[in-house]
Each structure stands twice: as structure tokens, then as C-alpha cells.
Amino acid sequence: MKRTLSFITLFALLLTACVGEDGPPGQDGELAPSFEVGNVNFLPSNNYSVREDYGFEVFPTEVTLAYILWDDNSGQANDIWRLLPQTVIFDDGNDLVYNYEFTQTHVDFFLEGSNLGLLGGEWTQNQVFRVVVVPATQVNGVDTSNINTVIALGDIQNFEVR
């Protein structure tokens, strides 16, 4: 009995001490690649649309989130980032939508509205956007409208300014 117990103990020790081969190496890189695009101008000549290439690989299982820097008219230096699309309804009944679409190679920012030609420069000139690419499985149940939540989720240290 003592010999059997010793054999089982030795066998268990050897079995748990074994090490298998290492698995394949994972991909290096950021958890959530991100960048900022400044001085975006929406003009009739560019059909109120601007394209920005990612400059990095985006996989079919990832989604792009885009945010616009919003002026809160408070006179304070508050950065307010709103998730696109964003809609503005003017007093005269006209409307404006800041929108975007994305592929695996680029993101397009564009304006939609009932009469874009009437918009002042404050709505079409020098707009600033932030883009974050995240795995689709990570955004389920996450408040993506809050850029700070997305920054924490993706462990984003800073946004590359383009």
C-alpha cells in the first residue's frame, strides 16, 4: 500500500510538472488603434465629405467608432467628444447630420442635411474628429457614446494627431 501511494504521488508530481510547447505568438500592437484628424473642411468641392486612410491593418472583426469635438458654447476649454452620427436642427427648420462610414482601409466623414449650402463656417470648417478601432466583441454592453469609457477599454494613452 505504501509503495502504491508513493508511486501515485510520484506520478502525479511528474504529470503536473510537465511543460508543453509554447503556443503561437500573439500579435503585437495596440489594443485599440486610434488617431485624431484635425482641420477637416466640408466644402461643396469635396461634396461635404472627407476620407482618412487608417494607415494600419483593420480586421473584419473590428468596428470603427468616430467622435466629433463639440463646442459647448460655454467659453470654457472643455473638450466634449460626441459619438457620430450627430444631428443638429436649426431654428429655421434646416438640419445637419455629421456622419461617418468605414471600411477595412479608411473612414469617411460626411455631412447630410436639407440645405448644406446655407451652413456657416462654424459648422463646416476646422472640424476635429477622433477615431478608435476596437474588436466588435469588446463593445457589447459598453457605453460607446462616452469616449472616456472607450479610451479606458482600449487602454489608449494618446491619439496620434494627423
Predicted regions and their residues:
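Hydrophobic helical h-region of N-terminal Sec-dependent signal peptides
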Residues: T9-A12
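Positively charged n-region of N-terminal signal peptides that target proteins for export
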Residues: M1-T4
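C-terminal motif of bacterial Sec signal peptides marking the signal peptidase cleavage site
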Residues: L14-A17
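Extracellular attachment/recognition segments
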Residues: V37-G120
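Collagen/collagen-like triple-helix recognition
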Residues: G20-F35
